[in-house]
Amino acid sequence: MFKPELLSPAGTLKNMRYAFAYGADAVYAGQPRYSLRVRNNEFNHENLQLGINEAHALGKKFYVVVNIAPHNAKLKTFIRDLKPVVEMGPDALIMSDPGLIMLVREHFPQMDIHLSVQANAVNWATVKFWQQMGLTRVILSRELSLEEIAEIREQVPEMELEIFVHGALCMAYSGRCLLSGYINKRDPNQGTCTNACRWEYKVQEGKEDSIGNIVHIHEPIPVQTVEPTLGIGAPTDKVFMIEEAQRPGEYMTAFEDEHGTYIMNSKDLRAIQHVERLTKMGVHSLKIEGRTKSFYYCARTAQVYRRAIDDAAAGKPFDPSLLETLEGLAHRGYTEGFLRRHTHDDYQNYDYGYSVSDRQQFVGEFTGERNGALAAVAVKNKFSLGDSLELMTPQGNVSFTLEHMENAKGEKMEVAPGDGYTIWMPVPEDLALDFALLMRNFSGQTTRNPHGK
C-alpha cells in the first residue's frame, strides 16, 4: 500500500542521525547563505557532504534547502556557490524564488527541485504551473484545508505533494514575515529571523490625531490584564499600540483585534490525527518543522509520526495515544492549523510565548558505555531516585521507576544534578542502547518548573 515519506529537520548532523534512527525516510537542511536557516545551521560544505553520504548509505534521502529571497548581490555568486553542493549529490533542492529556479534549471537541468512553502502554492493551477516548469514536488502552503489539498491531489495527480504536519507556525502568510526586520534589522527572508513574534508585548488603546497619525491615549497597561476577545466575542474596530517589553517608548500600530500577552504568537501545528486521511489522499511527504529544535525533538517526532504513517499504510485505525505522547514535547499549545476550520483562539496562544510541557522532560542521553548491568547516561536535566522515567529507543520504549544510580566511582547517588554530569543506572544487558534517550514523567510539574509541587 502507498506509504508517504516521513521528512524530518536536520539542523545538525546529530539531529539528522537521531531522526533517521527513529524512522525518518528523509531530512532537509539549509545551504549556507541561501536558506532561511542561516542563524540555526551547522551545515557547512563539509557537514553537508557528510550528511548526504550518511543518508545515502542508509538508503535515505537528503534535501538541501535553498529558499532565500535573494537580492541582486547574491545572484552574482549563486551558481558558483551552488555547484559544489550539487556535486555532493543531494536528492533535491528546496527552492522558492523563480529566478533562482530558472538559473538552476539552466545550469543543472538534472537536479530535482521541490517548491518551498515560501512560494505560497495554494491552488491546483499553481501546482500545475510548477509541474510544467520541471519541478518534481510542491510543498503546499500551510494555509490550506484538507479539502483543498484533496482537490489539488485530484487535479494534478502526477505531481508529488508535501505537507507540514508538525512544528512551529508563523503568523505571517506562508512564513513571509517582516516583523524581525522591522524591530531589530534581522530580515527573516534572508535567514536571520529572531522570532520576534514570540517576545512579550504590551498593548494600549490608540487613536488618530488631527493630522492622521496614530497615537496612544494613556500610559501602557500590561497586556496580561486585557481579556482576549478574538474568536469568542464581537470584533472590535479599535486601534491598538504595541510596545515590545525591551523597547519602551517604541510603538507599532495594530488594526487587528488580537488582544493578548503575545498577540502574534501562534500555537504549534500538530496534525498527526490527519495522517491517515493524508495517506489515503496520496500526499507523498509529511514534513516536520524543526527550527532551533533538539535531537530529542527530532527523535520523538520521528518515532511518533513513523508509527502513525505505518498504521495508516497498514489500514489500522488512528491510535489516540499518539496525541498524548506528543504532549511530552515542550510546545506552545497545539492546533490543527488550517487543515480544519476553527475559531481564531484555537490558532493563537494568548497566554505565553515559550514552549512548555506538563507531561515529560528530556533528562538524559545514553552514551553507549556499559559496565555489566549498568549503562552510562549523560545527564541533561535533573532527576532523582524514585522518579518515573521512560527509556526511549528505536526498538521501543520502556517505563520504570528509578531505584538505583551511581557515579563513575561506584558511589550511590540520590540525585543526578543536571547537565554536565554522567551517572550509571541499571539497564537490561540485552537492550540495545544506540540512540537511546531518557525522559522523566511529570506529576504536577512542568518543564518551566520541573521540580515544583
Across the structure, where does each feature detected by a protein language model lie?
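Conserved phosphotransfer cores of two-component systems
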Residues: 108
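Glycine-rich, positively charged N-terminal anion/phosphate-binding segment
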Residues: 37-54
